[in-house]
Swiss-Prot record:
Post-translational modifications reported in the UniProt record: Activated by phosphorylation.
Cofactor entry: Mg(2+)
Entry superkingdom: Bacteria
Protein name: Phosphoglucosamine mutase
Gene Ontology terms: cellular component: cytosol
HAMAP family, sorted: GlmM_B
Family matches, as Pfam families: PGM_PMM_I, PGM_PMM_II, PGM_PMM_III, PGM_PMM_IV
InterPro entries membership: A-D-PHexomutase_a/b/a-I, A-D-PHexomutase_a/b/a-I/II/III, A-D-PHexomutase_a/b/a-II, A-D-PHexomutase_a/b/a-III, A-D-PHexomutase_C, A-D-PHexomutase_C_sf, A-D-PHexomutase_CS, Alpha-D-phosphohexomutase_SF
Family of the protein in this entry: Belongs to the phosphohexose mutase family.
Organism this protein belongs to: Cupriavidus metallidurans (strain ATCC 43123 / DSM 2839 / NBRC 102507 / CH34)
Residue numbers carrying Phosphoserine: S106
Lineage: Bacteria, Pseudomonadati, Pseudomonadota, Betaproteobacteria, Burkholderiales
Length: 447
């Protein structure tokens, strides 16, 4: 079923343009209240949902719209103010609430925003539940009787509760004393959370990207723009740099030499540390874009590897299907289901730090078993509706190229979901091999 509003991570778009308007978001809150909450009345008679947000200026407007929609549906609302997305997942579960809602567009610029939902268990909603909400949005919005209206109030200790949870995922027998860490909060939801977590565990913390003004989220800072973090690590002689995105559900790491490590490498590191700690790791989940070197390295550790569609929600689905615990994406979404129900940048950083502390090794030493293959990506613009999957010339070139990689590389061809482009990606041990194969495949598409 094609969905009208929900994408891979909730409803998202440019603020002021449909669907990110106050009117639609109010109707969305009302619809979600009907679908998620009204079957879960509490001893007080009304279900309660939790609403958090990042630091975008539009968050005030959309928060008010959601509040109106939920309360009109007879649902009580708790407001946290700015809080990382995984913090909302955690509090929704531990406070025994009917649902959690996050107002954020993650790593996007400030003029975008979005709405995503968590179930009572702190999991992202499955596609079928989002489809139910979409169907309800199309129904006329009706307000419950005045006696049944919901109430709204702010929860004052949300940040403190979440900070303590994050710290609890770090091994008690270790601390961070003696480490100097630069923490880049992307001027986002972690600005008043992440520095405290690492400081309270003993680290010397240097914070950057921690002065949000409503319009500077992700602007030159954070996981999608690590240049300032690299500079700060070198300038301050820090041991490590940690970068989060606007809602702090993804992580990038920089070592003392300024080298950047992405989610693929960090997934391997966490798997290896779990094994070194005596934990059995049967398998891990990546995506179609996960570097093949990681897949091969995990197999050398005896760990099965499965690829999901791009998007952390699909990684989670595969983890649940196989009853595994560890997965992630190169973008820095890492799932450690033995620690949290969803991807969490701060918790992921603590798993990396735990590996460093337990092993006494550096990042390069812990990652000596994996060297990422060079990737070449070419975007080929095509006519709308172009049937690339049945393109005879492309098939002929692919049938010739793939055997030449000899199982030490791969070809991935897929259509963009947002523009008339076919993406051709080739991985190989040698950059020249990847570039040559990608050029040949792209030329076949253009012919």
């Amino acid at each position: 079923m094609t969905r009208k509003y929900f994408g891979t991570d909730g409803v998202r778009g440019r603020v002021g343009d449909a669907p990110i308007t106050p009117d639609f978001v109010m109707r969305l809150g009302h619809a979600a209240g009907k679908v998620l909450a009204l079957g879960q009345k509490t001893s007080q008679g009304k279900p309660t949902v939790l609403i958090g947000k990042d630091t975008r200026i539009s968050g005030y407007m959309l928060e008010a719209a959601l509040e109106a929609g939920f309360t009109a549906a007879g649902v009580n609302v708790l407001l946290t103010g700015p809080l990382p997305t995984p913090g909302i997942a955690y509090l929704t579960r531990t406070l025994r609430l009917a649902a959690g809602v996050v107002i954020s567009a993650s790593h996007n610029p400030y003029y975008d925003n979005g709405i995503k939902f968590f179930s009572a268990s702190g999991d992202k909603l499955p596609d079928d539940v989002e489809s139910q909400i979409e169907a309800m949005v199309e129904e006329p919005m009706t307000c419950v009787h005045s006696d049944e209206l919901g109430r709204a109030r702010r929860i004052d200790d949300a940040a403190g509760r979440y900070i303590e949870f994050c710290k609890s995922t770090f091994p008690y027998e270790h601390d961070l004393h003696g480490l100097k860490i630069v923490v880049d909060c992307a001027n986002g939801a972690a600005y008043h959370i992440a520095p405290h977590v690492f400081h309270e565990l003993g680290a010397e913390v240097i914070s950057i990207g921690n002065q949000p003004n409503g319009r500077n989220i992700n602007a030159g800072y954070g996981a999608t723009a690590p240049e300032k973090l690299i500079e700060a690590v070198k300038a301050n002689g820090a041991d490590l740099g940690l970068a989060f995105d606007g809602d702090a559900d993804r992580l990038q790491v920089v070592d003392a030499d300024g080298r950047l490590y992405n989610g693929d490498e960090l997934l391997y590191l966490i798997v290896r540390d779990r094994q070194a700690s005596g934990q059995r790791v049967e398998g891990a989940v990546g995506t179609l874009m996960t570097n093949m070197a990681v897949e091969l390295a995990l197999k050398r550790l005896g760990v099965s590897f499965v690829r999901a569609k791009v998007g952390d929600r699909y990684v989670l689905e595969e983890l649940n299907r196989h009853h595994w615990q560890l997965g992630g994406e190169g973008s820095g979404h890492l799932l450690c289901l033995d620690r949290h129900t969803t991807g969490d940048g701060i918790v992921s950083a603590l798993q990396v730090l735990a590996a460093l502390r337990r092993s006494g090794k550096t990042l390069p030493q812990l990652l000596d078993g994996v060297s990422l293959f060079p990737q070449t990506l070419i975007n080929v613009r095509v006519e709308k509706g172009f049937d690339w999957q049945n393109h005879a010339g492309l098939k002929a070139v692919r049938d010739r190229v793939e055997p030449e990689l000899e199982g030490r590389g791969r070809v991935l061809i897929r259509a963009s979901g947002t523009e008339p482009v076919v993406r051709v990606m080739v991985e190989a041990e040698q950059v020249e091999t990847a570039e040559r194969a990608a050029q040949e495949l792209a030329a076949a598409l253009r012919a």
